[in-house]
Amino acid sequence: MAAPSSHADAVAQDLRDVVRLLVDRPQDVAVEVVDEGDGFFLEVTAARSDAGKVIGREGRTIQALRSLLTARARVDGERYDLDLLD
């Protein structure tokens, strides 16, 4: 598996910073970048008690995060997918 691009690493850091602002236990937030060949998969982990905050009411927060990643992907010329792991 190839190493993530510098774009993907920067996106992961930005995503981690945003998610840390949303949760009660920011020290438990991590974002791992997985190179899928045709794009990057960003796996967010957070404390189980914070999962609802990351997902948001009716999934609005995680959908907003995905929308931000889509916009960033257009700028970077990459593809980013997001999933919350528990």
Regions found by a protein language model. Give the residues of each.
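RNA-contacting regions in translation and RNA-metabolism proteins
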Residues: 1-51, 64-86
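Glycine-centered tight-turn and secondary-structure capping sites
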Residues: 55-59
